[in-house]
C-alpha cells in the first residue's frame, strides 16, 4: 500500500493485483528484504518501443544480499493494456546469455505458470528456493506472448546487457541468436528471504546514481561500490543497497521518469526492509534553468530545498534514516551556468547545515577539483564534466562512512 503522497504529481501504482488475476499471495509470515531494484519508467519520447510479443527476455541483474529464497517483482506500471508473462525462470547467470547448469528454477504466480498484470500494477512471483550468494548476477527469463502493448514499462539505462530471443525459450541454458538489450523491461525488483539483521538502503537519485558512464557489465556505480564494502564489514554484511536512480531525473518535475517527489512512495516506502535513504538529486533541476523550455524549468534554491525536505520528512515519518548527499560539481557541463552554480552552492550549504538530514554524505567535497571547486577532479571526470567515471564512482562509494548503517 502507498502510505503517503508528497508533491503534486499523483502516480497511480497498484502493488498487489487481485487474486482473480494473480492467484494467492505469499505467506504473511515470511520476511523479505530487497536485494535489487530498478525504478520503472515509461519508454522515453523519441525512443521506439521494442515489439516484445512472442519473444523471450533474459534480463541480468546484480543482487546485493544473498538468500536461500527469492521472489521477483514484475511491473506493468506504465502499460495501457494488460501484460501477460509466462514461463518465467530465475537462475544464476553464467555470463552473457547463459545460465549456470543446475540452477534454473521456474517461477509461478499463485501456483500458476503465467500471470496477467493489469495496467498500472506490479506483482511478485511466488517464493522460489534458490541459494543465491551475495553480489551475484541472476538471469531472469520470461516469455512475452503475442499481445497488444501500446506502452511499455522499462528502466532505460541498465548499464548491463540483457537479451531477447524469438519464441518461448525461457528455460534454455543459452539463448541462441539473441539480440542484446541495454534496458530492463517489465522488471522492478528482487527480494530475498531476510536473514537476521537484514535491512536495506535506498539510493534515490539521477544518472549519477544510475551509473551513467561507468563501465558496462562491471557493476561500478557508486551504490555497487557501497554494497561491496558492506559485505566485507563485520555486522553489516546483511545490509543491501537498492539503486533507485534514473538518468535525467529531477526532484520537482517530471523529465525522465516520474520526479523524485512523485516516485518516493513506490521507490522508497514500498521497498521491503528499508531502514536508510541516501538522496542525491537536484543537479538536473538546476541545470535545466539554463535552458528553460517552460515555466516548470524556472526554479530557485528554496524550491529545490523544499522538495528535498519533503522527501526527508516523509521518510522520517516511517522510521527511515535519511542521509543528504551534496550535489557534485558540473562546471563545463552542457547546461552549466553561473546562476546554476550559485544555486548548487546554496543547496549544498543547506544540505550541510539545515539539520533536515540525519547525516550528510559530502559527494561534492569528495569529487571536486581542489584547484577549481566548480569542476570535477580531472581524475574523476568521465569527460562530459557532469558525470564521474569509474574512478569517481569508486571514490564516492568509498567515501561513505559505513557507521551510518550500524543502527
Regions found by a protein language model. Give the residues of each.
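Bacterial N-terminal signal peptides that target proteins for export
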Residues: 1-11
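N-terminal secretory targeting modules
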Residues: 2, 22-204, 214-217, 235, ...
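Bacterial N-terminal signal peptides
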Residues: 9-19
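Structural recognition of the beta-strand scaffold that forms the well-ordered cores
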Residues: 71, 200-205, 209, 239-245, ...
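Alpha-helical scaffolding within the catalytic cores
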Residues: 185, 223-230, 256-272, 306-310
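Glycine- and acidic-residue-enriched helix-capping/strand-helix junction motifs
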Residues: 211-224
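Oxyanion-hole/transition-state-stabilizing segment in secreted/luminal serine hydrolases
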Residues: 214, 246-302
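Catalytic His-Asp segment of secreted/periplasmic serine-dependent ester chemistry enzymes
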Residues: 261, 287, 327-407
Amino acid at each position: 500500500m502507498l502510505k503517503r503522497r508528497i508533491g503534486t504529481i499523483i502516480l497511480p501504482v497498484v502493488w498487489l493485483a487481485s487474486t482473480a488475476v494473480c492467484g494467492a499471495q505469499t505467506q504473511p509470515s515470511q520476511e523479505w528484504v530487497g536485494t535489487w531494484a530498478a525504478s520503472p519508467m515509461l519508454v522515453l519520447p523519441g525512443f521506439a518501443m521494442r515489439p516484445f510479443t512472442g519473444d523471450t527476455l533474459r534480463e541480468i541483474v546484480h543482487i546485493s544480499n544473498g538468500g536461500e529464497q527469492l521472489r521477483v517483482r514484475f511491473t506493468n506500471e506504465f502499460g495501457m493494456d494488460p501484460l501477460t508473462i509466462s514461463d518465467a525462470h530465475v537462475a544464476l547467470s553464467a555470463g552473457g546469455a547463459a545460465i549456470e547448469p543446475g540452477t534454473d528454477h521456474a517461477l509461478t504466480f499463485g501456483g500458476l505458470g503465467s500471470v496477467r498484470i493489469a495496467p498500472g500494477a506490479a506483482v511478485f512471483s511466488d517464493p522460489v528456493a534458490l541459494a543465491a550468494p551475495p553480489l551475484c548476477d541472476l538471469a531472469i527469463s520470461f516469455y512475452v506472448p503475442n499481445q497488444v502493448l501500446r506502452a511499455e514499462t522499462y528502466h532505460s539505462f541498465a548499464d548491463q546487457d540483457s537479451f531477447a530471443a524469438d519464441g518461448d525459450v525461457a528455460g534454455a541454458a543459452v539463448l541462441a541468436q539473441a539480440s542484446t538489450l541495454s534496458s530492463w523491461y517489465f522488471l522492478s525488483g528482487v527480494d530475498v528471504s531476510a536473514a537476521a539483521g537484514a535491512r536495506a538502503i535506498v539510493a534515490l537519485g539521477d544518472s549519477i546514481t544510475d551509473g551513467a558512464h561507468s563501465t558496462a557489465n562491471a557493476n561500478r556505480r557508486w551504490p555497487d561500490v557501497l554494497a561491496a564494502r558492506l559485505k566485507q564489514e563485520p555486522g553489516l554484511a546483511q545490509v543491501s543497497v537498492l539503486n533507485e536512480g534514473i538518468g535525467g531525473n529531477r526532484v520537482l518535475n517530471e523529465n525522465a521518469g516520474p520526479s523524485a517527489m512523485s516516485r518516493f512512495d513506490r521507490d522508497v516506502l514500498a521497498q521491503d526492509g528499508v531502514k536508510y535513504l541516501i538522496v542525491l538529486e537536484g543537479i538536473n533541476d538546476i541545470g535545466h534553468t539554463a535552458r528553460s523550455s517552460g515555466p516548470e524549468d524556472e526554479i530557485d534554491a528554496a524550491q529545490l530545498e523544499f522538495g528535498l525536505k519533503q522527501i526527508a520528512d516523509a521518510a522520517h515519518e516511517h522510521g527511515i534514516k535519511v542521509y543528504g548527499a551534496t550535489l557534485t560539481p558540473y562546471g563545463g557541463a552542457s547546461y552549466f551556468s553561473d546562476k546554476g552554480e550559485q544555486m548548487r552552492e546554496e543547496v549544498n550549504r543547506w544540505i550541510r547545515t539545515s539539520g533536515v538530514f540525519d547525516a550528510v554524505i559530502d559527494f561534492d567535497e569528495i569529487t571536486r577539483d581542489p584547484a577549481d571547486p566548480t569542476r570535477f577532479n580531472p581524475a574523476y571526470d568521465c569527460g562530459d564534466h557532469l558525470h564521474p567515471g569509474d574512478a569517481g564512482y569508486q571514490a564516492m562509494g568509498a567515501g561513505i562512512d559505513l557507521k551510518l548503517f550500524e543502527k
